[in-house]
């Protein structure tokens, strides 16, 4: 129902898969030996007309997996609930990190007064 394909350099795999199937393809550009993955990113986002590939950020397989779950959740409702739970966990982690940063800033202000 959805394929995640990674590629470094000219990143042929995502584009080749997209040209051969009607299944949604998510391309993940990977860092290679040169250009720090920018070449891979350009290869994936510059697909010709009629060969769509959803492009993620460089080395962003995690986001590709989340995006694939979002696509699959349209047909498989149980995945939607799992995604909502996952996003709630992420939100709680961000709030905890924000609270920690604010506490650290308060302590630093106290040291310089």
Residue ranges and their predicted role:
Residues 1-29:
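Glycine-rich phosphate-binding loop
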Residues 7-16, 35-38, 61-65:
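Short glycine/serine/threonine-rich phosphate/pyrophosphate-binding segments
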Residues 30-34:
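Short, acidic/turn-prone active-site loops that include or flank metal/cofactor-
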Residues 37-113:
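C-terminal binding/interaction regions
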